[in-house]
Structure formats: structure tokens, C-alpha cells
Amino acid sequence: MISHQPAKVRFDGRRVRRHRNRQRIVAAMLELVRAGVISPSAEEVAHQAGVGLRTVFRHFDDMDSLYREMAETMRRELQPIVAAPFASEDWKGKLDEMLERRARLFERAMPFKNAADVHRHRSAFLRKDYETMRSEERAALASALLPELKNDKKFFAALDHALSFSTWQHLRRDQKLAPAQARQTIQFAMRSLIGAVGK
């Protein structure tokens, strides 16, 4: 049967379907990773998204763009926590708030960080995204500190490590601490470092 639809309409329809399928695939990957599936298979994604396996394979040809869309979705989800202003004007109070905020952020994002760690070696986007995340963490920490502490390289490096996503991940995943225990452990390290420089 010959279609009497204009070619542009048929093309636009295919483009809309492709976009919708892509959104379903990204949402499916996010849900699978959130559920603890570190490296979802094409079959798992197809089942979760409700699309055909061939459709998934077509999108899997460009994994970096899928990772980018997943990262953008996560950033939008976490932005209200990141952007919230500090209630405290005192630098120590800001650090306490930063720890509480990062504990919530890291806990919500940890399944995605675990998955990203597995794939980073073969993804230019994930490597760049990791570098961006670490740069943002350091900049946020520097903005909360007194100038003399920010410029103390040993102190800053140690505090940056204590408050990093990697430390949270190690305490939660490798040492198997509960979220409250992980937060208390980091708080102990943070206060010990502050005490070590006489503040």
C-alpha cells in the first residue's frame, strides 16, 4: 500500500518516535542502575523500557550520549540540594552543613557513581564528568574555608579527601557502614583535622 503522507511528515514522525524511545531507554537505564544493576544489559533495558531489542542496540551504539543524558537527569534531580544556600555564616557551621548536604547527595547518587566507575575507562564523557564533579567539590569546599586554611595545601587536601564522594563510597560500600555511621565517621575526621591546625 502506498503512503500518501508527505515525506516530511513521515520523517518527523520517525524522529518523534526515536526521541520517545530514547527517553524510555534513558529512564530505564536510570531505574535499573538505581536498583543496583551496575551494567544493565540490552535485554534488561529493552524489557524495562518496553521497546524492542533492536531499538536498544541502535542507541547503545553511542553510549557516551546516553551517559550524558543520564548525568543531566541526575543533575536536575539533585540541583535543589546543591544550590541551597548555607544557613550558617560561620565557616565551621558551613562545613557541618556541607557534610550533611553531601551525605544526602552522595547517598542518592551512589548507585550511579558505582556504575560510572565500572565504565569510566572506556567513556570520555564519564572521565570528564568525574573531573568536573571533583572540581566542583573542591571549589565548594574552598569557598567555605578561611583563606589561611584554603591555602594550607596539606590541610585542604586532607579535608577534601575526607569530604569526597570516594570516601563516602568507601565507607558505605567497602566498610559497609550505615549512612549515619558514615556521616559520623567523616565528621570525626573533619573535626580532627580542624583541631590539628588549632582552629
Task: Describe the predicted segments one by one.
Residues E31-P40, H47, R68-M98:
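Amphipathic alpha-helical linker/stalk segments
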Residues R104, R108, N114, R122-A157, ...:
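Amphipathic alpha-helical packing segments from all-alpha helical-bundle domains
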Residues E72, R76, K92-H119, K128:
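Helical hydrophobic small-molecule/effector-binding pocket
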Residues G50-F60:
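Short hydrophobic/aromatic patch on the recognition helix
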Residues F156-P179, S192-K199:
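Amphipathic C-terminal alpha-helical segment
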Residues E43-E44, R54, D64, Q169:
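Residues within the helices of the helix-turn-helix
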Residues M1-S39, E43-Q48, S65:
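Basic, helix-initiating cap at the start of DNA-binding domains
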